[in-house]
């Protein structure tokens, strides 16, 4: 099924169905982070399975981090194995958001810190970051990729909602939209949301976990919600 035909099928569905049947079929690269919002609440959900792409060993870890104002979902290479030990990017980023709540400063610190490790211990893999926050009654999303080749590679090149303080599709308004990753943030499904964000987000991830075709999705559903008061 092509990407355009997937989107066409999605538009035909008005209630929560088994969305995982419509989204990306390459089992070995599958991961799942789903976000959805209306005007009152933003919900981000993820599975908790991590699969080592060399040994195929499976471990479990939360892929969503947060402070009182920001939600961050991680995809791709969350851990970097080096001669000096294992660098856990989730712990690196968690330390950043413990000290900073401004999303723009958080983004800059993540880029500077993670790129420092990638440039020192170069490899071909990458870390993708989905950054969510609320500003002026808008729930906002910024998604980008970090690796040894690019300082920053923004995603969200398919227009949805409308741009926020930008002309180049790098920050998106999530109100009444969903954002669902298949093979990472750069290969995603998105569209208009006409149902409850909490139900949609949780059920989408749960369906992917229960789908035996998706061998790298598993564990429990982890969910974080953000409203006008924070998290």
Model-derived features: where do they sit?
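Acidic, low-complexity central loop/insert segments
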Residues: 144-145, 155
């Amino acid at each position: 099924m092509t990407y355009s035909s997937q989107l066409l099928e999605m538009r035909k569905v008005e209630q929560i169905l088994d969305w995982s049947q419509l989204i990306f079929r390459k089992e070995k690269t599958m991961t799942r982070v789903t976000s959805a919002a209306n005007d009152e609440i933003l919900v981000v959900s993820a599975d908790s399975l991590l699969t080592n792409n060399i040994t195929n060993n499976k471990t479990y870890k939360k892929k969503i981090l947060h402070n009182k104002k920001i939600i961050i979902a991680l995809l791709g290479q969350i851990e970097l194995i080096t001669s000096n030990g294992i660098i856990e990017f989730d712990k690196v980023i968690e330390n950043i958001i413990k000290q900073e709540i401004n999303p723009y400063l958080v983004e800059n610190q993540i880029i500077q810190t993670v790129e420092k490790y990638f440039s020192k211990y170069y490899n071909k893999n990458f870390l993708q970051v989905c950054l969510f926050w609320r500003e002026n009654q808008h729930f906002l999303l910024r998604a980008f990729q970090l690796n040894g080749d690019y300082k920053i590679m923004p995603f969200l090149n398919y227009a949805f909602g409308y741009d926020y303080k930008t002309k180049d599709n790098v920050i998106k308004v999530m109100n009444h939209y969903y954002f669902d990753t298949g093979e990472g943030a750069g290969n995603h499904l998105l569209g208009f949301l006409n149902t409850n964000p909490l139900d949609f987000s949780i059920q989408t991830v749960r369906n992917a976990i229960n789908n035996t075709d998706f061998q790298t999705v598993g564990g429990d559903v982890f969910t974080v919600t953000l409203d006008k008061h924070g998290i």
